Amino acid sequence: MIQWLMNIDRRIIFVFVFLGVALPLLANVFLPIKPTRDVIAVYDQFEKVAEDEGIVLLSFSYGASTEPEMQPMARAILRHCFSRNIKVVAVCLWPEAPGLARKVLEEIGDEFGKIYGEDYAFLGFKPGNFAVVLNMGQDFRDAFPQDNWGTPLEKLALTRDVRTLRDFDFVFDLAAGDSIEFWWIPYGQEKYGFPFAGGCTAVMAPDLFPFLQSKQMVGLLGGLAGAAEYETLVGRQDKATAGMSAQSMAHLIIVAFILFGNMAFFLSRRR
């Protein structure tokens, strides 16, 4: 038995790893996920907006290369907003983002029977990076005079009374780059003082922790793990939960085989 453990056929390991990844993705076998403090803070802020029947601004600042991490996050947030009748205005500050933003808005909007122009609006892409954020804070309609299809904002019931960023009860940036720390915080939140939070790729999350400590951000969703935690809070397990469960099960299987191999090695030395 000890000798067998020390010489396990690699194909057996591959089969176990395959099953560990396939079960969550194909059979919806999920591991429990415990939401962290920063994710709960974002959820609670959206709940405060819902209590006041408020309006939020979602900024899409990611592209196709980070879709696997960011799109599940957007889906979970929109499900929360639409299930609680929160009004959503969406903008894009990355040129790759409009297609992804429109897709998820229409998908989740149809899921909850939401009406465009009344429950949500999509204003499309605007070039300029931080200058757009600054412009939205001064005169929102100067930055975005019309929606993605050319309809003036004053003709949409949802955006008729929106003048500046201060008219939003909450601003949330879905970021794959540096838009949170270099655009939204210095030129938006710090200047105009609105409640702000963000979601980012996992590799970016540590860079944003100082903004949580300084209270410039209400909370933070970091990568696929943050999206999975938010799905848990919303009560709808989706792609993020499946992806994190697949990763976790694969890691557990690999660690188990490492432990078995080391145990077999030390036991063989005793003989």
What are the functions of these language-model segments?
Residues 2-13, 246-249:
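N-terminal membrane topogenic signal
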Residues 5-6, 258-271:
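Juxtamembrane interface at the cytosolic side of transmembrane helices
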Residues 11-26:
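Hydrophobic membrane-insertion alpha-helices, especially the h-region
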Residues 31-51:
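Alpha-helical transmembrane signal-anchor/signal-peptide segments
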Residues 54-62:
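Acidic/histidine-rich, surface-exposed loop or edge segments in extracytoplasmic proteins
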Residues 65-121:
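Membrane-embedded segments
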Residues 117-205:
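Membrane-proximal low-complexity regions enriched in glycine and acidic/polar residues
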Residues 210, 214-248:
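Short, aromatic-rich amphipathic segments at membrane interfaces
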